[in-house]
Each structure stands twice: as structure tokens, then as C-alpha cells.
């Protein structure tokens, strides 16, 4: 595992894996924030509460993806400057991006509080869970500043090769989240609001810890007065990368949000099944998503250092690693789909169980598709072509949304059509992205 890694030297596969493993572990722990809520809420409160948290999670991901996209885009710029050895440009970029993303966070927070009810009505949230979902989201977005701070500092540390430190603070936060969930729900009987409060408090601990560590232990990232200025070059670079990556994340999650509205129209049982299955699927393919992010950092550092031969070798190594890992995960999810669903739902809830198993087995058979797509996203960001990542996202999500509504309208297909639209969108975007890569690189 790397704490202060120069990704422009050393064996490619070993370097990538050592850098990626803490990020994979961190991504799984990140899912535990919502998994802890989902598991405890589903088992201790009931199916309605599970449906509320699951549907809320989709909206949370869409809105938080704006901040995440800005942080990912900024992190790519940080990696390019770090790989080129330009530390003064790195610090200027850190200042510009922090101010930019901080301002967006404030605007987003105000927008959520003003328009939360119209958004929930647009999503066709059933009345029997409307109040629970609204209360949960209100509390979650009171703590959105913690999400911004943690993601920003984590992106900054990873950009300079430290993938371990964000993991430790996240692990502490997840452990606290689970303890507080149990205390607030089982002991204080605060219900779904208690789960939201636990998540916000845990995220606050993670953000405070990572800020304090960076200030004390990483003086090269500490800003000086001379770094705190908006020079045109830094501002243009950050806005270009961050905006396009933000658009990519937003398009991705807006498409998912539209599909959530379609899922909601099938009733609470399908909503609950989808909520549980999405959490399982997120665990299953989140490692390849983080591998794609680590791969992007690797490519960006080497692109900044002009190590183009190493980039080509890295592409081949990453592709092979992703395919092997994805096949293993696909087999495991297909075989153990029912036991995995039983973690979240009671055995007697047969309709929820059957629907969730169907979702997992259809989507899970094609995890290679999403794994390769994450590599393509990371590659095009790192070589200063973030617009191509947006194009691939539009292809993937556009196909998914269109097919979902088309197939779900066929009585003999119904909700199953929504599940099939997911891998079809992945595979189509993969084909376009790989064809473009071969056209530009001749290999």
C-alpha cells in the first residue's frame, strides 16, 4: 500500500494494485455509511423504512455526485502537476478548487432545502413513506459540508500517491456510524431520523480528522499566502476539468434518478427490492470503480511526466486485471444472489426477495462491462479529454433510460426490462470508448 507514492516509477501492475487496494477498501467502507442505515433500518423498523432509505439514497447520490465530480476533476489536475514536479502550480490549484467546490456546496445546500418537496413529488414517492424519506434527507443534507471536506482532502492526498490515510479516517467514521445507528435506533427509538443523524456525525469525524492530519503531516500541501490567488491559468484548468467531470457524474446519476422514478411507479415492494439489490451491487462493482479512479491517477501522473510508453503498458495491465476481477465477482453474485438479499429482507417477504434476486443475476452477469467503462472514464480524464468521459456517460445512461421506459411499458416484460437496460448501456459505451482509443492510439 502506498502512502507517498510516485506512480511514474516501478513495476506497473504491482504499483497499481498497491495504490488501489486502500482505495478499494475505502470505497467499500464508504458504502457502509448507507449499508449500515439500510441493514439496521430494514431489520429493526421495516420494509417501508427500507424503501424510504433506498429511494433517498438514489437522490443523495445524484446531488452529492456534483461535489464528487468536482473533487475528482480537481484531483486529476493535482496529479498532472504532481507528476510534472510543479508543486507551486499544485498548491495554486488546491486553493482555486477548494474555493470553487466550497461555493457550489453552499448553493447546493440551499437549493435542496428550498426544492426538496417538489423533487420528492417528481420522483413519485408513495405517500406511505413520503414523511420518512423527507425527514431522512433533510438531516443528511444538513451535513453535506462534511461530505465536501472529506472528498476534497481524500482526492488531494490520493493525487500525490497517498491512498492509505483517507482509508484510516473513513474506517473510524464507519465504525462510529454503525455504533451510533444501533444506539439511536434501538436504544433511543429515534427511527429513520436517528440513522441520518448517525451518518452525519460519522462523516463529521472523518472530515475533521483528515483536515487535521493533512495540515500537520503534509507541509508540501499546506497553502502559503502567495498560493491564495485566482490566476487565470489555474482557474481555467480547474473549471475545465472539474466542470466536465461534474457534468459526467451528474448525467450519470440523473439517469439513475429518472430510473428510480420509474421503479417507484411499480410500488413499495419493488422499491424495497431495488433498494437492497442496489446496495449489494454497489458493493460488488465499487472495487472496479475505485480501480478506475486509481488508474486515472496513475495515467495522469505519467501523462504529466510524459511517460507515454508506461501509459500504454498501464492500459494493458489495468484491462487484464479488471476483466479477471469482474468475472470472479459476477460468478459470486450470481451464485449467492439469494443469500445476499436475505441480509436485508426477511425470508417471508417473497416478492421483494424474488425481485431483488432477479435484479442481481441480470446485472451481475455483466460486471466486466462496468469495469471496463470505469477504466475508460479514468483514462480520458487523465489524458486531458474529460469531454470523452461525458460522451460515454451520455451513451451509457441515455441507452439505459430509454430502454428502461420502453421495455417496462411492455406488459410481458415489466420491471425486468429495467434490469436488462443496465448492462446493455454499459456494453454500448464500452464499444464506443474502445473504438475511439484504438483510432487515436493505433493499438
Feature map (PLM): residue ranges:
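Helix-terminus/linker motif at the lipid-water interface of multi-pass membrane proteins
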Residues: 28, 32-50, 120-127, 183-190, ...
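Residue-level signal for short hydrophobic patches within transmembrane helices
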Residues: 9, 13-32, 36, 59, ...
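Transmembrane helical elements of multi-pass membrane transporters/channels
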Residues: 18-37, 139, 150, 173, ...
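Small-residue hotspots at the loop-to-helix junctions and early N-terminal turns
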Residues: 47-58, 137, 196, 268-283, ...
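Generic alpha-helical transmembrane segments of integral inner-membrane proteins
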Residues: 24, 28, 32, 36, ...
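Short alpha-helical transmembrane segments in multi-pass integral membrane proteins
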Residues: 1-20, 78-143, 187-243, 299-366, ...
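Small-residue-rich hydrophobic transmembrane alpha-helices
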Residues: 50-110, 147-166, 273-337, 370-392
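Short runs within selected transmembrane alpha-helices of multi-pass transporters and secretion channels
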Residues: 71, 139-158, 166-174, 195-210, ...
Amino acid at each position: 500500500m502506498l502512502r507517498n507514492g510516485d506512480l511514474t516509477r516501478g513495476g506497473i501492475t504491482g504499483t497499481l494494485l498497491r495504490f488501489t487496494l486502500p482505495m478499494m477498501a475505502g470505497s467499500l467502507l464508504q458504502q457502509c455509511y448507507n449499508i449500515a442505515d439500510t441493514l439496521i433500518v430494514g431489520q429493526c423498523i421495516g420494509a417501508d423504512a427500507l424503501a424510504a432509505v433506498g429511494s433517498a439514497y438514489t437522490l443523495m447520490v445524484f446531488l452529492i455526485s456534483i461535489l464528487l465530480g468536482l473533487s475528482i476533476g480537481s484531483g486529476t489536475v493535482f496529479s498532472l502537476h504532481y507528476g510534472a514536479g510543479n508543486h507551486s502550480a499544485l498548491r495554486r490549484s488546491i486553493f482555486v478548487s477548494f474555493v470553487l467546490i466550497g461555493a457550489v456546496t453552499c448553493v447546493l445546500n440551499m437549493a435542496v432545502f428550498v426544492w426538496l418537496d417538489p423533487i420528492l413529488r417528481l420522483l413519485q414517492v408513495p405517500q406511505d413513506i413520503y414523511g420518512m424519506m423527507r425527514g431522512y434527507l433533510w438531516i443528511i443534507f444538513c451535513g453535506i459540508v462534511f461530505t465536501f471536506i472529506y472528498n476534497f482532502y481524500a482526492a488531494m492526498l490520493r493525487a500525490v500517491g497517498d491512498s492509505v490515510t483517507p482509508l484510516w479516517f473513513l474506517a473510524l467514521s464507519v465504525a462510529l456510524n454503525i455504533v451510533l445507528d444501533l444506539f439511536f435506533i434501538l436504544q433511543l427509538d429515534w427511527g429513520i431520523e436517528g440513522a441520518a443523524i448517525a451518518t452525519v456525525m460519522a462523516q463529521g469525524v472523518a472530515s475533521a480528522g483528515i483536515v487535521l492530519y493533512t495540515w500537520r503531516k503534509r507541509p508540501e500541501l499546506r497553502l502559503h499566502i502567495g498560493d491564495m490567488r485566482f490566476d487565470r491559468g489555474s482557474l481555467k484548468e480547474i473549471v475545465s476539468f472539474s466542470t466536465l467531470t461534474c457534468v459526467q457524474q451528474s448525467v450519470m446519476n440523473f439517469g439513475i434518478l429518472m430510473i428510480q422514478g420509474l421503479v417507484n411507479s411499480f410500488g413499495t415492494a419493488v422499491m424495497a427490492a431495488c433498494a437492497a439489490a442496489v446496495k449489494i451491487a454497489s458493493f460488488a462493482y465499487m472495487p472496479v470503480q475505485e480501480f478506475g479512479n486509481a488508474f486515472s491517477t496513475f495515467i495522469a501522473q505519467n501523462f504529466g511526466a510524459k511517460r507515454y510508453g508506461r501509459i500504454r503498458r498501464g492500459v494493458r495491465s489495468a484491462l487484464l486485471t479488471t476483466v479477471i476481477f469482474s468475472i470472479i465477482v459476477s460468478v459470486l453474485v450470481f451464485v449467492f444472489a439469494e443469500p445476499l438479499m436475505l441480509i436485508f429482507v426477511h425470508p417471508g417477504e417473497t416478492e421483494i426477495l424474488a425481485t431483488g434476486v432477479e435484479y442481481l443475476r441480470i446485472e451481475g452477469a455483466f460486471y466486466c462491462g462496468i469495469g471496463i467503462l470505469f477504466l475508460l472514464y479514468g483514462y480520458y480524464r487523465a489524458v486531458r479529454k474529460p469531454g470523452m468521459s461525458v460522451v460515454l456517460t451520455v451513451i451509457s445512461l441515455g441507452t439505459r433510460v430509454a430502454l428502461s421506459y420502453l421495455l417496462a411499458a411492455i406488459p410481458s416484460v415489466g420491471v425486468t426490462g429495467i434490469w436488462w437496460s443496465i448492462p446493455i448501456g454499459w456494453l454500448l459505451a464500452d464499444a464506443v470508448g474502445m473504438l475511439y482509443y484504438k483510432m487515436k492510439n493505433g493499438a
